[in-house]
């Protein structure tokens, strides 16, 4: 008789076989790949000994080039050389053109409104461009490690939404990589530092890359990494420092906009080189198309100071969300190449009141953390007790009668998570229910973001309030949401995977949070009014239906007139804006209809007992 082999989920069926896995930091400006070798997580270098791969792809008619060689072509072939593609994932063409009007690419819109880049090699979408970067990193890992990869962990900004996360996974699939997990970049940094230093307590991870900024407040305790709160800006990074400096140099050189694509790229390269030099020098000599001059670090810092302050505002919000004071933060982990900027380190240190940690290369720390996590998920460390708890950035809810939002999963809930709540029908004989999934902190649907709608059909016709519909929200480890609605008596159910078409920027997330606090009082007043209106509608509809069914038999003409007057008075109040007045009107109507309700109850009891003997009862 054959034996059935049993293995732990996600782990090798051959427990002593070491599986090859890698962590990939898919960055806006640069990307890296890391793996655990001989017990240590290290980044994997190319043939020239470089760990960094520029996130740049050049498409010529003959070939696809990725990395440094592609970057070298950017100045001469800007339309065919795609840079910072991470900013484009999960966004509509309209959104991209409004956010980044100076991009040198030739865009066109696909049938579903998504962006397509026209290159010498043909049309490419952002997912295909990302896939080419991932393919190059996967190839480097397999050549260095000497075998096929069992899987990869890919890092994403903490504020990437469903569309951006799904796009990243699709890119990996296109690159032929098996994704073990998507991991938030700040969480990956915490893994790298947490395991190395054995810290326990509250840690802030300040991640300023080329195109995105993330702040995460984490609590590290006995191997458990819990993200208390996150914040950031998906459209702020070192690239913006470059653009500000480029604009300044353009002004100093007396150049007029717009520049040609080639000159624009050359100017950005000068700005980037100048910015990097300021990490070592107080002033830099520049040559901008024949104009020669000196730029000081102080001038550069004056340009970027407002942007650094903007990151600190996000830090302040994240601390408030985590219910943590800046003084409670034990360590500040610096992540991302842009944290090499001296002003950034100085202002972050002043804000938190301590010198930031920079002992691990800020360019490599995220990839190293991802490499450690990939090694664990591949099953190479079955005894690992490390637990990872990410959070959702905005509450997930459902629309109820009156345009109200009922929150199912509150913001900053750790994931993966599943929450269920029961709802019922509003009208007699209702056989279908529309489920509207929303995201946000406000009390009314109109003030939140719509994610998806679907219908549950086949509900047995019953009296209003008799049906029981269980709605379940489930967010997986990658932050993707699925919603299920099930009618309990029949088991009929409907389900939807929520993948919004376009991304929600961190500025929009921050604005939604700020609006929820600014409008908290008026939101609660609006909710109270909506709730009373819904209750008034229920009372009015119920009383009218009862009078149509039994009014002629159980009520005198005068009693009918009195009840109709009560209904009219309640309708008038219901159409007003005074929640307290509507509540009182409901009480008055209930009181006026009390005798009628008693007579209907008596009639129902008599009908139920008709034809039965005492012994039967």
UniProtKB/Swiss-Prot annotation:
Any Pfam family: HSP70
SUPFAM superfamilies tied to this protein: Actin-like ATPase domain (SSF53067), Heat shock protein 70kD (HSP70), C-terminal subdomain (SSF100934), Heat shock protein 70kD (HSP70), peptide-binding domain (SSF100920)
GO annotation terms (biological process): iron-sulfur cluster assembly
Record-linked InterPro entries: ATPase_NBD (IPR043129), Heat_shock_70_CS (IPR018181), HscA_NBD (IPR042039), HSP70_C_sf (IPR029048), HSP70_peptide-bd_sf (IPR029047), Hsp_70_fam (IPR013126), ISC_FeS_clus_asmbl_HscA (IPR010236)
Gene Ontology molecular functions: ATP binding; ATP hydrolysis activity; ATP-dependent protein folding chaperone; unfolded protein binding
Keywords: ATP-binding, Chaperone, Nucleotide-binding
Entry keyword annotation includes Cell membrane: no
Role played: Probable chaperone. Has a low intrinsic ATPase activity which is markedly stimulated by HscB.
Recorded family membership: Belongs to the heat shock protein 70 family.
PANTHER family linked: HEAT SHOCK PROTEIN 70KDA
Cited HAMAP family: HscA
Name of the protein: Chaperone protein HscA homolog
